Amino acid sequence: MSNQLLDRVVAEIADEMAQRADRGEVASYIPQLARVDPKAFGLAVIGADGHIAAAGDADVPFSIQSISKVFTLTLALGKAGDRLWRRVGREPSGSAFNSIVQLEHERGIPRNPFINAGAIAVTDLILSGHQPREALGEILRFMQFLAGDSSIAIDEAVAKSEQRTGFRNAALANYMKSFGVLDNPVEYTLGVYFHHCAIAMSCRQLAMAGRFLAHNGQNPSTGLNVVSSERARRINALMLTCGHYDGSGEFAYRVGLPGKSGVGGGILAVAPGRASIAVWAPGLDAAGNSHLGRVALEGLTKRMGWSIFGV
């Protein structure tokens, strides 16, 4: 891969996105997110050699929201291994990210770790044996370690905004608790969940944190193994099939990469063996995924030939 080509493609895509009028709708159900500039756009791509191609608002922190679920899943698998799958499934949901319908049919077991119910169950596992502050600190330190940046922090205003308005998540958690899926007090688990979703990162930081998924579980800069190659492959598989909720099929069809979105407008995508990619555009589509983020990634994979399904 030519770094010059990548730099040019990333700059071109940022310029093209700046001209687009179809930006989607900024999330409004979390009041603090509704204040974000809808015209913001950032893109950062980190290659195997550590070269970073960045453009637009790539260094502006934003609320990563559900993208944090990739990292809590990684932590939980490190703690519990395959025992985690007794609490949560691995199938696409086909429903909205905050739907309670399938929990009713499947006795409180969430379909996958990336819908809200699944991520709450994963958070509960991380919390077990810890105080909420300790569990949250572990998650934040893990993110800082992966990104190599201790300045990454939680946006308390966003966390409090979610706590004040997160009634659907409270319903999901209480419903799972009634089936014995959650071990800890619901308010503790939700507190940790709301706070890790409120971690703020830039595209550059997020792309750095995701590098291990692009390189068989290893950080290529340090040579340190974060997870085994098998576990990295399986996390990527879940990102491909479940990472964009009921828009996951469309994302796979158009972009062809494992990816995880968040309602803050971010997407973390993985080009295995090639690059870790983070894009941010706050306007969302009907499924709650970044509209221009997906468009930008589709352009990137086409021009670079990065789709996992072929050129």
Curated annotation (Swiss-Prot):
So what does this thing catalyse? L-glutamine + H2O = L-glutamate + NH4(+)
Return the SUPFAM superfamilies for the record: beta-lactamase/transpeptidase-like (SSF56601)
- EC class: hydrolase
Which Pfam families is this protein grouped with?
Answer: Glutaminase
Which biological process annotations from GO are given for this protein? glutamate biosynthetic process; glutamine catabolic process
Enzyme Commission designation: 3.5.1.2
Q: Which InterPro entries match?
A: Beta-lactam/transpept-like (IPR012338), Glutaminase (IPR015868)
A GO molecular function term, named singly, is: glutaminase activity
The reply to whether Hydrolase figures as a keyword in the UniProt entry is yes
Tree of life domain: Bacteria
- Which terms are listed as keywords in the entry? Hydrolase
Sites where the protein binds substrate: S66, N116, E162, N169, Y193, Y245, V263
Name the Gene3D superfamilies for this protein.
DD-peptidase/beta-lactamase superfamily (3.40.710.10)
The record's note on quaternary structure and interaction partners says:
Homotetramer.
Q: Which family does it belong to?
A: Belongs to the glutaminase family.
Supply the name of the protein: Glutaminase
Q: Which organism is it from?
A: Rhodopseudomonas palustris (strain TIE-1)
Query: What is the primary gene name for this protein?
Result: glsA
